[in-house]
Amino acid sequence: YTFLAFMAVASHTRCQFTAPGVVPAACTPPTRPNIQCDDKDEEEQLNIYYGKLHSRYTHHRTGTIKPRTSHYCHEVDAVVIKMDHYCPWVNNVVALFTQKYFLLFVFYTCLTCILCAITLGGRFLSCYRANARSKYSGWNTSQKKAEWCSPDKTDTVVTICNVVEALIFGIFTIAMGCDQAEAIAENTNYIDRLQKKRGEQQTLLQSMQDVWGEPFGWRWFFPLAPTKEHRVTFQRFCKETWVQLAMFEPRVKRAFLHDVQ
């Protein structure tokens, strides 16, 4: 129990104080090109298309680029990559760099609740059987067993509160774990699912490696900082978005115009 509780607290602490993956304020879109064409209709269409492109990959409040799977969070007033939701339990955003710690926090909290329920349930069952034997068979329980099965009022109240908390938080963490498992399996965060969007198709193992930031190993079960893979993913998302905006140049305008039509 002590180990599980320690791991839950450690995971919660790492999740609370880890930067979730905020797009830096300096990561602004490239300067908008001055589009001039002989054909006014073509120029107007290009400006409209670039406006849509700019609104898709930049955020109007922060002025920064907005990579795919990223969303604006009012709590931190920034664009966060692979944002799932803001969790008041950890006072942080569950996103690219914090989802691993959030999942570990939920996992170890759930195990702690299950262990509490099993331990207290076992105590109740053991005492029930002992009292039944003593009542119907004349079998005398030991003094230690009798004291354990006849708690005082304080012990009774604490036990009842423990059982209630274990059931409530156990059910809550199981539900949260199922929701996160669905998000990982579909490679789609919570906000994107609300917007009817779907992430890239990939295997479950690939999705889990994206969340944990490294291939499967013993480090998955501990709130340790992942390898460089998470940082590479963060930089790749930002670079892809910047390139999408920077590639809009006169030399490729006809290709974009063809896409618009």
Task: Describe the residue ranges of each PLM region.
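Membrane-associated feature with strongest affinity for ZDHHC
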Residues: 1-261
